[in-house]
């Protein structure tokens, strides 16, 4: 029995891979999906192309996933887990004057994934496919805000409260809007707008909690 990747437990799989070799096949499908997204975007993606790139039979794809959207959802959840783990590790290192400065860490890790993780620059957390790709009951940015709030309280030194919940939602929405503009102006993210995003978050969060 192979260990199931945590993100797959929440993905719309027809069934979870029960053996190590099945898990490896599913991982290859997700890797193939990431590569193809970078090459042609979601509109050019298909289960047939994913199967060909992953080196598996099309029947193997449908054994686990009903369609290409389900595969991108699993990939988006994988990205969310990776992002969460990276931010948690950085926050655990400490060294910040105040937890509101964690905004820099969050933005830096997001940018590094955009530049280095296959498929992330094309999918990010799923809005290009569906604004509720990560969770059919919740908007993607809300899912991200919940994760970040948990990180800030567990590792960053913030205290759980209703005001924090609202502030993190606003911060995520604001950062998302400015970063999308930064990527429209420069494929790697306009450096000036990235710095403005960090300043915006530090100032906003500092106003409420500094």
Describe each region flagged by the PLM.
Residues 28, 36, 40-70:
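Helix-turn-helix
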Residues 100, 104, 108, 142-149, ...:
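An amphipathic alpha-helix signature
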Residues 1-24, 210:
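N-terminal intrinsically disordered/low-complexity leader segments
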Residues 74, 88-115:
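Hydrophobic alpha-helical connector segments
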Residues 25-33, 50, 75-83:
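Generic hydrophobic, amphipathic alpha-helix propensity
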Residues 122-126, 134, 154-201:
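Hydrophobic/aromatic-rich alpha-helical bundle segments in the mid-to-C-terminal region
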Residues 96, 116-123, 131-134, 142-168, ...:
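Hydrophobic alpha-helical bundle segments that form small-molecule/ligand-binding pockets
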Residues 72-79, 86-87, 140:
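Alpha-helical DNA-contacting segments of helix-turn-helix folds
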């Amino acid at each position: 029995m192979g260990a199931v990747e945590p993100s797959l437990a929440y993905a719309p799989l027809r069934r979870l891979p029960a053996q190590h070799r099945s898990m490896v096949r599913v991982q290859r499908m997700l890797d193939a999906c990431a590569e193809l997204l970078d090459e042609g975007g979601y509109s050019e993606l298909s289960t047939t192309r994913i199967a060909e790139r992953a080196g598996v039979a099309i029947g193997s794809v449908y054994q686990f996933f009903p369609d290409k959207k389900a595969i991108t959802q699993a990939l988006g959840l994988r990205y969310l887990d990776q992002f969460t783990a990276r931010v948690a590790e950085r926050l655990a290192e400490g060294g910040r004057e105040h937890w509101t400065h964690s905004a820099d860490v969050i933005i830096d890790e997001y940018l590094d994934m955009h530049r280095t993780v296959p498929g992330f620059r094309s999918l990010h957390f799923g809005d290009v496919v569906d604004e509720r790709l990560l969770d059919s009951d919740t908007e993607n940015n809300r899912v991200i805000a919940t994760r970040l709030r948990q990180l800030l309280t567990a590792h960053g030194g913030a205290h759980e409260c209703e005001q924090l919940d609202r502030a993190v939602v606003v911060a995520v929405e604001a950062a998302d809007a400015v970063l999308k503009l930064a990527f429209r102006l420069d494929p790697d993210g306009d450096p000036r707008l990235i710095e403005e995003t960090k300043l915006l978050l530090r100032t906003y969060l500092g106003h409420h909690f500094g």
